[in-house]
C-alpha cells in the first residue's frame, strides 16, 4: 500500500500549465489530411472554419496568436500558420481547463467561442466534474478482497450513495475489483493508473501507458499521490481525459480508525468537495459511509446520489 500523498492546487496547475514547454504529443491518425484555412482576427467567430491537426493558413495563425496571447506554448515563439503537434497540445491543454469543452484538439465553433469571447466554467481539478453542492466520497487503490468490494458497493447503493472509485489496473487484474459491477450498482469508476507509480517521474509515453488497460479506460483519472506535472497533464489531454484529485484528504492510510475517518470527513468537508479515502483501509464499508452521510446531513450537506447505473465514460458534468 502506498502511503505518501501530495496535493497540487488548482491555482498552481493553471498558472504552470499556461507556461508549459512543448512536450512530445501522441501522433494524430496517419490519415489526417490538412487543408488551407483562411480567416482574420476580425472574422466573426461563427464564420471561422474548424481547424484540425495538419491545417495551414491565415486562420491557423489567428488561432496561434490567441493561444500565445493566453500564455500557451505552441512550440514556437511566433505564429507559423501550421497546425502541428505544438498547436495541438496547446489546444488540448486549453480545452482541459474548460468544464464543457471536449478535449479533442479540434477548434470548432464552441472552442473558437471560448477562445475569443471567454466565459465558460473553469474546470476544478480537485472537485472534478461535480457541479452540485453535494459531497463526493471517493476511494482509491484496492479493497482487501472481492467480497469486501461487493459489500461496500452494495452497502453504499442501499444508502442511495454514489461513490467515486479509483482502482489500479493491477487490482482489477488480481480479481479484487470489477468496474462493470461497480457501474451496474450506480458508482463512478475512474482511472488510477495500472501499477500506482508517481506519474511525474515517468516519460510521456510511460504516462500514456499507465492511463490504458488493464487500468480503467474512461474520461477522468486520478494520478497516484495526486502528483502531476506538464508531461502528465499533456498525456491525460492526449487521451481526452481530465485529472480529478480531491479537496479533503482523510489520511486514512496512516491507520486511522473508522471513527476518526468519519469525523474527519464530517468536520472538514464543504459543499461540492471531493473526499479522498482508500478501499484497503477502515472506512470502505456500509457503516462508515452511513455515518458520513448522516454526519454531513446534520451540517446541511448531502452526498452524491446513486443514479442506479453509470457508464464507462462520464459526461463533462456530474450533477450528483
Regions found by a protein language model. Give the residues of each.
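Secretory targeting and sorting signals
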Residues: 1-35
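Sec-exported extracytoplasmic/periplasmic mature domains
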Residues: 65-72, 92-100, 112, 116-120, ...
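Active-site beta->alpha N-cap acidic-glycine motif
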Residues: 113-198, 206
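C-terminal domain-boundary segment and adjacent tail
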Residues: 120-129, 155-159, 172-174, 283-320
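Acidic-and-aromatic substrate-binding clefts and catalytic sites of carbohydrate-active enzymes
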Residues: 142-148, 166-177, 197-204, 222-228, ...
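His/Asp/Glu-enriched short active-site or ligand-binding loop at hydrolase and phosphoryl-transfer sites
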Residues: 227, 232-233, 237-268, 301-312
Amino acid at each position: 500500500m502506498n502511503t505518501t500523498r501530495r496535493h497540487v492546487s488548482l491555482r498552481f496547475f493553471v498558472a504552470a500549465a499556461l507556461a508549459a514547454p512543448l512536450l512530445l504529443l501522441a501522433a494524430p491518425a496517419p490519415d489526417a489530411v490538412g487543408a488551407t484555412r483562411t480567416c482574420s482576427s476580425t472574422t466573426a467567430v461563427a464564420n471561422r472554419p474548424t481547424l484540425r491537426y495538419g491545417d495551414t493558413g491565415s486562420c491557423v495563425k489567428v488561432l496561434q496568436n490567441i493561444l500565445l496571447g493566453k500564455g500557451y506554448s505552441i512550440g514556437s515563439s511566433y505564429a507559423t500558420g501550421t497546425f502541428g503537434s505544438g498547436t495541438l497540445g496547446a489546444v488540448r491543454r486549453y480545452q482541459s481547463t474548460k468544464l464543457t469543452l471536449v478535449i479533442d484538439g479540434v477548434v470548432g465553433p464552441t472552442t473558437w467561442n471560448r477562445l475569443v469571447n471567454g466565459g465558460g466554467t473553469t474546470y476544478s481539478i480537485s472537485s472534478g466534474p461535480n457541479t452540485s453542492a453535494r459531497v463526493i466520497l471517493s476511494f482509491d487503490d484496492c479493497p482487501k478482497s472481492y467480497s469486501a468490494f461487493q459489500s461496500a458497493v452494495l452497502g453504499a447503493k442501499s444508502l442511495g450513495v454514489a461513490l467515486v472509485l479509483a482502482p489500479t489496473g493491477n487490482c482489477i487484474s488480481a480479481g479484487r475489483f470489477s468496474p462493470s459491477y461497480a457501474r451496474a450498482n450506480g458508482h463512478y469508476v475512474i482511472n488510477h493508473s495500472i501499477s500506482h507509480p508517481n506519474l511525474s517521474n515517468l516519460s510521456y509515453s510511460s504516462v500514456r501507458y499507465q492511463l490504458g488497460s488493464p487500468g480503467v479506460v474512461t474520461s477522468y483519472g486520478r494520478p497516484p499521490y495526486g502528483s502531476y506535472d506538464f508531461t502528465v497533464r499533456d498525456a491525460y489531454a492526449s487521451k481526452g481525459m481530465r485529472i480529478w484529485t480531491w479537496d479533503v484528504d482523510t489520511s486514512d492510510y496512516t491507520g486511522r480508525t473508522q471513527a476518526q475517518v468519519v469525523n474527519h470527513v464530517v468536520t472538514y468537508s464543504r459543499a461540492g468537495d471531493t473526499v479522498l479515502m482508500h478501499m484497503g483501509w477502515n472506512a470502505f464499508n456500509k457503516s462508515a459511509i452511513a455515518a458520513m452521510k448522516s454526519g454531513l446531513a446534520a451540517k446541511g450537506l448531502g452526498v452524491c446520489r446513486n443514479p442506479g447505473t453509470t457508464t464507462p465514460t462520464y459526461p463533462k458534468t456530474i450533477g450528483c
